[in-house]
Amino acid sequence: MGAGNLRVVDGAPSLSLDSDELAHDYERISATRQFQSGQRLAVDLGVLPGECVLDLGCGTGLLAEHIADLVGPHGKVVGIDPLPLRIELARSKRRANLSFEVGDAYHLDMLEDSSFDAVIMNAVFHWFPEKTRPLLECARVLRPGGRLGIGTVLKGHRTRVHQIASKVLAEPPFDRFPRPRAQLTFPVDAEEMRAFFEMTGFSASLIEVRESTRMWPSPEAAIRFSEASSFGNFLGHLPPELKIRARATIRQRLQSLMTADGIIHHGRRLVAIGVRR
């Protein structure tokens, strides 16, 4: 599916703010903590040699490449992401059992029913404004008894970067350009996740809240992470000159959080494994 064929879901973040710079930043930044959390999620999911696995919201393909090694030559991994620039980077990771396509979680039309043993979504679910359609699509492409693994932001646990950014954006002159709802995330809590599983054909085998620690070496690194991981939506609603000012203000306020080890955020992450009924 080409990028021009993607269907925008009401309230979803913009896909037009990504850039080569942000995509390469994301490749570099996600190679540490986010990739490691994805590796742990693959363990929770119990990925086995010979299985067919869908990495939904695969980004630049680091986790998909790792899973391709886990499933081995008799298995298969397909990575799907709505951002063409990130899929372009992902396709540089060449494996005979690994492929990537531009597409979105709401419309997996290119994938056949009951064609996967497992689906993994790492750091993706909180971007969906409407949750049931992606879960129903996952249920459709999974075989009966197939597993879905989700690692996502826990509701009510925003990073310090986003807390400070929200305060800055509520002040003049930035408040003249309110951030669209589509440029915010849509996290859930454990009970909401359980309910979503139940209504979309999954039995929960694991729903767990885990402690999570993030560290950024500098205020600039924290801002760049937020921009890259949000594919430009972090401050993308501001005119260019105000975006520069907002970045400078956020950077200045983040400086007060610096320790000898950098800016440290202790948060919580929601991990869920569902089995298709």
Regions found by a protein language model. Give the residues of each.
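Class I SAM-dependent methyltransferase SAM/SAH-binding core
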Residues: L54-L56, T60-L108, R133
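A short SAM/SAH-binding and catalytic strip from SAM-dependent methyltransferases
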Residues: A118-K131, L154
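A structural alpha-helix within SAM-dependent methyltransferase catalytic domains
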Residues: A42, E65-A68, L135-A139, S166
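Conserved class I S-adenosyl-L-methionine
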Residues: G2-E51, L62-H66, R86-L89, K93, G149-D175
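A short glycine-rich, Lys/Arg-flanked "PGG" loop and its adjoining helix->strand segment in the class I
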Residues: T132-R147
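Conserved Class I S-adenosyl-L-methionine
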Residues: R7, G11, L15, T60-L62, ...
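A short acidic, Gly/Pro-enriched loop at the edge of an enzyme's catalytic core
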Residues: Y106, M110-V119
